[in-house]
């Protein structure tokens, strides 16, 4: 649907280089990268606010690189939401509709409709500065969605919210997506957002989009050491949860809390311990695993473990490697506490 | 609690000199005029004085509006665009502040000669030269205080640049622009030097004060001064109050 072709841009301290990717209809595309990597500049180029030095942007095959923002029909939500402070919530949401010369009654109906879906219909007469962060974010989303944009551009949408509001909004975002069926490009530095909401992800490091792909693929198979180091979380497992049990193939993994349905969980390599014999402890997940690789990292050793088809990486110290006498191809037991598992909502 | 902060007391004592210095002449002239009420009544009924006051108010108001009409677009450009020579333009805008006002009058007369000599146009020309910087700089500061992201969002929602200016940037910068307009107006009301050279006639109140002083002395020029001050100050204070309320 949207095709970004070799975009380059020097803008203040940011240097974007040869950025190419495409976004499919109905997709939630995440651009993941540390701060200062140029994510916002890229988003504003797509929005038409900044023009690129080189490269093209195509919307359904049509070159829109030269179009001003108002002709693109993309909605942009900046990190600070940029609600119009001199207008009420109603007028904020109605802004785009009024520009489209929609009759007043129709505008009021649409505003009310979207405000109800987002749970802000009781705030319509208020001024933005009287709202909480979470409420402001909902207003910004309502204002963006009410015009039925081709593309929703979100810059760190949850970065300024407290943890609880954030996870609540992430959950609701999934619902709104079903309800409104939008296509989104979502810029973030949060793995949690990428794993919870993303269909595909592009990893952006120092002005380059270094890897694009399915969220799970990118997280489990980083193309370069740079990406792997940035992602940190090397063990991402996807399965079906039923309460506190996650089913992944034949494995039953105990989770730290109750979840239902398809989820992804992450375990840090340093949270996995290795035994030579199975120990029965109720609080632990213990699985038989085959050592497929041993990589020397100095004081630490990285093991590649195969747990009946699932690949996990684990760190152990060099001394315990020698003590346990672990060799490639050997059978060991891998264990991790349920509390060490991070469940991505 | 810590010991008394003597440094601050000391600074306050030094600083209050200037406050007293500004307030004292104002209070004195009002007080002295109150004792000479008869002369004040006489001046209020002097058609020459009333005509001059009217001229001052009209030209100052016209000047403020003209400086806003041209100053607001310029302020917007200065706030939003980086271009070559921007610093130079900014410096030019601040030049009128450093030129002696009699010199301003001479320059204007040399440049526009008969087109502005002794006419309303001349008064406004002189006022505009010295007051425009206030309008431009306040407008620029007002637009600078508007988060550019607001304009970006308005654009993506379908507003053209000009539409965005009128529905987002201008309303938000309005208090600052208005206070720039008031400063331009106040500066115009207080201008003498350039007007004296460019347009002695039609006579403005500022000029009349000087003429009465030269011809009839202090006692004759005092009541006009008091009236001029009363009008200027009350309009100034009222408008400032109004802006303060809008800002709330």
UniProtKB/Swiss-Prot annotation, chain A:
Transmembrane segments: none annotated. The complex is composed of two ATP-binding proteins (WtpC), two transmembrane proteins (WtpB) and a solute-binding protein (WtpA). Residues 2-231 form the ABC transporter domain. It comes from Pyrococcus horikoshii (strain ATCC 700860 / DSM 12428 / JCM 9974 / NBRC 100139 / OT-3). It catalyses: tungstate(in) + ATP + H2O = tungstate(out) + ADP + phosphate + H(+). ATP binds at residues 33-40. PANTHER family: SPERMIDINE/PUTRESCINE IMPORT ATP-BINDING PROTEIN POTA, SPERMIDINE_PUTRESCINE IMPORT ATP-BINDING PROTEIN POTA. This is Molybdate/tungstate import ATP-binding protein WtpC.
UniProtKB/Swiss-Prot annotation, chain B:
One of its GO terms (cellular component) is plasma membrane. The chain crosses the membrane at residues 10-30, 57-77, 92-112, 116-136, 165-185, 224-244. Residues 1-9, 78-91, 137-164, 245-248 are cytoplasmic. It holds the Pfam family BPD_transp_1. It is a multi-pass membrane protein. The keyword Membrane applies. The keyword Membrane applies. Gene3D superfamilies: MetI-like. Keywords: Cell membrane, Membrane, Molybdenum, Transmembrane, Transmembrane helix, Transport. Residues 53-239 form the ABC transmembrane type-1 domain. Residues 31-56, 113-115, 186-223 are extracellular. It is found in: Cell membrane. GO terms for biological process: transmembrane transport. Belongs to the binding-protein-dependent transport system permease family. The complex is composed of two ATP-binding proteins (WtpC), two transmembrane proteins (WtpB) and a solute-binding protein (WtpA). Part of the ABC transporter complex WtpABC involved in molybdate/tungstate import. Probably responsible for the translocation of the substrate across the membrane. This is Molybdate/tungstate transport system permease protein WtpB. It comes from Pyrococcus horikoshii (strain ATCC 700860 / DSM 12428 / JCM 9974 / NBRC 100139 / OT-3).
